[in-house]
Design a protein with these regions (language model features):
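Short, surface-exposed amphipathic charged segments that create phosphate/polyanion-binding patches used
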Residues: 150-154, 287-295, 415-416, 465-478
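Conserved acidic residues
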Residues: 52, 203, 335, 362, ...
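Hard-cation-handling environments
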Residues: 229-375, 386-387, 422, 437, ...
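C-terminal, active-site-flanking charged/polar segments
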Residues: 359, 434-479
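Charged, amphipathic alpha-helical linkers/stalks
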Residues: 459-521
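Short, compositionally biased "basic patch" segments
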Residues: 191-206, 292-299, 370-396
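Generic long, charged, amphipathic alpha-helical segments
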Residues: 387-418
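His/Asp/Glu-rich metal-coordinating catalytic cores
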Residues: 1-55, 60, 64, 69-252, ...
Length: 535
């Protein structure tokens, strides 16, 4: 009975754990790495065709995004997840496949012009469709006997619709051990979905630590704050454009806007229209509607019992086709437009920015974290001009930040979750956190509970019967590793720009002692360059 750590170890993305007992091979999560990597990750030790079962904690791509890839490489086993996770994976994995195909085509156009070999996408839409045939939906809080020696139960993790912590009872050589995989533990008091459910016993815990070194601020009343932004924008006669992630954040915005309308928080503009312009968000919203009874919290269920849909209201419009999307900007009435992607790197949001950024009466409202190097980050940090579709756009719109509701538990909430376990686990493994955060939280767990706690490296393996480490993973660091997604590519290019700036400073320092005429000429050249790019 051996547990080997594969991904999201001393890093945040690419969650994957490999468990073997007897002749059975199991994966818990199979996520895609996103963004820069710190360490070289251990590959899954066996051919995917030998994997019997995969258990998915939730649908986010950093936990599910490589499922089509292992299917492409021969996996034909069974994937277990909650019904809502299964439904969300059905749309998110296909969307991810479209991105892989798009980026491969983008690279190949450049490769053909340069005479370089073409690349193939990591996986395609057919792989995503085929792997969905291997999903088996599971109910929360039911114990499933998967095979001799393996029982599992999914409990609500409160992170995303359908998210779960997984309790796993594994028996080998007449010894049974209970392993709990936390998944991503949610923040408390979020709209729509339930708070995290606690687990009361475990021999081993594999636990996330995303915010294991910080505490959340007391959140404002988001509906009230959002109403203020809408009112200011509509009073000027402009549009409110909200870049938002299609799954989760879009539905939260709908929840707040429904409150604004039903509680009459915007009496000056009671009948305003709201457009969802993201096919993925429309599909995800339908999934929310289909999983109400399993996943919604008590407050949302009270609304439903009263005949009120918590994410639907008069004036809500959806745009699915590209023609419907284009028509939004022909409507001159002030309106709210919610579109993806949340960091403005791709998707229809870029068209809405093109039509609204130049307007001093419009507002762009950010409701989520913006990665450095993305268009969203540039706008949030005061960019005066941006380029969209080859056209330079002057930024005259108001740029506002409404700090998003965090989807992850903070240090105190993580500690409370672990403290609900009544017995003393043999080992607690801290994963899914930046290296310094994972190490900090492992030390915090040891000091608080006197548990053996460690932040494993990818490739570290433990015998769960003896509680002994049986393999050391690689400690090899990487400076740059292939990553997926436009945001990652943009960040790499931005890093090149920073490096060029550092080189320029070095050259300037070497010029000390040169003739004043040459120094003056050099200064003029630098100032001319700055004038060209200072936006």
């Amino acid at each position: 009975m051996v547990l080997e750590f594969i991904g999201a170890d001393r890093e945040v993305t690419g969650s994957c754990h490999y468990l073997t007992f007897g002749d059975t091979h199991v994966l818990i999560d199979c996520g895609m790495e996103q963004g820069a990597d710190l360490y070289v990750n251990q590959e899954i030790p066996v051919n995917p065709s030998l994997i019997d079962y995969v258990f998915v904690t939730h649908a986010h791509i950093d936990h599910s995004g490589l499922l089509p890839l292992i299917y492409n490489h021969g996996f034909r086993g069974t994937i277990f997840a909650t019904k809502a996770t299964t439904d969300l994976c059905n749309i998110m994995l296909k969307d991810s496949a479209h991105i892989q195909e798009f980026e491969a085509e983008w690279k190949n156009r450049k490769a053909r012009r340069a005479g370089r070999p073409e690349v193939t996408p990591m996986y395609n839409v057919e792989d995503a469709q085929n792997v969905m045939q291997h999903f088996t939906p599971c109910d929360y809080n039911s114990v499933y006997e998967i095979c001799p020696g393996l029982k599992v139960r999914f409990v609500d993790a409160g992170h995303l619709l359908g998210s779960s912590s997984i309790e796993m009872w594994v028996t080998e050589e007449n010894v049974t051990k209970k392993i709990v995989f936390s998944g991503d533990i949610g923040n408390h008091n979020r709209p729509l979905i339930k708070d995290p459910q606690y687990v009361d016993s475990a021999d081993y815990v594999v636990m996330e630590s995303t915010y294991g070194n910080r505490l959340h601020d007391t959140p404002p009343d988001y509906a009230v704050e959002l109403a203020k932004v809408i009112n200011a924008t509509f009073t000027r006669g402009g549009n409110l454009v909200i870049p938002a992630f299609s799954v989760g954040r879009t539905q939260e915005m709908l929840y707040f806007i429904r409150r604004i309308k039903t509680e009459n928080l915007l009496p000056e503009h009671p009948n305003f229209e709201v457009y969802i312009d993201s096919p993925l968000a429309v599909e995800a919203t339908n999934v929310f509607h289909e999983n109400i009874s399993d996943c919604f919290d008590e407050e949302a269920m009270e609304l439903i019992s009263a005949g009120i849909n918590p994410i639907k209201f008069p004036g809500l419009r959806v745009a699915v086709s590209s023609d419907e999307s284009k028509m939004i900007n022909f409507d001159k009435k002030p309106k709210v437009i919610i579109s993806a992607s949340g960091m403005c790197e791709a998707g229809r949001i870029r068209h809405h920015l093109k039509h609204n950024l130049w307007r001093s009466d419009s507002t762009v409202l950010f409701v989520g974290y913006q990665v450095p190097g993305t268009l969203g980050y540039a706008l949030l940090n005061g960019a005066k001009k941006v380029k969209l579709f080859g056209e330079e756009i002057e930024v005259r719109a108001s740029i506002v930040n409404l700090p998003g509701i965090s989807g992850h538990a903070d240090k105190n909430q993580l500690t409370e979750w672990l403290g609900a376990i009544k017995n003393k686990p043999e080992h607690v493994f801290i994963v899914h956190g930046e290296e310094s955060t994972a190490e900090y939280f492992a030390n915090h767990v040891h000091e608080t509970f006197s548990y053996d706690a460690v932040a494993p490296y990818s490739g570290d393996a433990y015998d769960l019967i003896t509680n002994q480490k049986v393999a050391d993973g690689s400690r090899k660091r990487v400076e740059k590793k292939a990553s997926y997604g436009m945001a990652s590519r943009e960040k790499t290019i931005f890093d090149r720009l920073v490096a060029a700036g550092q080189r320029l400073v070095s050259v300037i320092q070497k010029c000390q002692g040169m003739a004043n005429k040459d120094l003056s000429k050099f200064a003029d050249q630098i100032n001319a360059l700055c004038d060209k790019w200072d936006r």
